[in-house]
């Protein structure tokens, strides 16, 4: 998935999506590994999810195609990320104002071109790229614009099919509303894993 909302798929898991060619002004946004017969589930910045059969996506040999040709996101929405895998697999969904939850991939799949609302985002808030949660012992790491990083066990994040979620990072509502302080990154680290912060 590119920052401009273009999508493509490549066979094999040894491909580095950051090294692919992108249109001028476009670049890498998010990627996921899965199998061709699984649905690719996209989430946009307004908290809506959409599903596309992965095998129907264009090849990575070209520049791909805009997702807006297949889906009908709300005006002003951009695609934030993509998910694939086991339908029972958990994914962390987080808004940049500090709220989030985990959801089963099967609860995010929809056949509607307009998608379905899964993460309630306050006006002015945006959804961050989703992260796969492989174990309740995994660490959820969230970072804000002031350089603070918080890590806590994934088991502390509620599982729900949709909603606003719990406050994962305390951002004063006035600062969130003015976009002065926000979450800028989220990652899930497995036991024994590491995190590099840029």
Which residues does each PLM region occupy?
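Short, structured "edge-of-domain" segments at secondary-structure transitions
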Residues: 1-198
């Amino acid at each position: 998935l590119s920052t401009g909302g273009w999508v493509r798929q490549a066979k094999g898991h040894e491909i580095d999506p950051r090294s692919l060619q992108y249109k001028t002004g476009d670049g890498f946004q998010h990627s996921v590994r899965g199998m061709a017969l699984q649905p690719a589930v996209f989430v946009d910045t307004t908290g809506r999810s959409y599903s596309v059969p992965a095998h129907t996506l264009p090849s990575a040999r070209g520049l791909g195609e805009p997702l807006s040709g297949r889906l009908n996101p709300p005006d002003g929405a951009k695609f934030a990320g993509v998910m694939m895998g086991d339908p029972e697999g958990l994914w962390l969904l987080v808004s940049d104002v500090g709220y989030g939850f985990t959801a089963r991939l099967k609860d995010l799949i929809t056949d509607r071109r307009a998608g379905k609302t899964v993460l309630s985002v306050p006006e002015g808030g945006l959804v961050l790229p989703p992260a796969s949660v492989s174990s309740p012992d995994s660490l959820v790491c969230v970072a804000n614009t002031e350089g603070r990083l918080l890590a806590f066990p994934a088991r502390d994040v509620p599982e729900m099919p949709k909603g606003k979620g719990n406050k994962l990072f305390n951002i004063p509502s006035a600062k969130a509303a003015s976009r002065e302080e926000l979450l800028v990154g989220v990652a899930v680290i497995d036991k024994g894993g590491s995190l590099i912060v840029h």
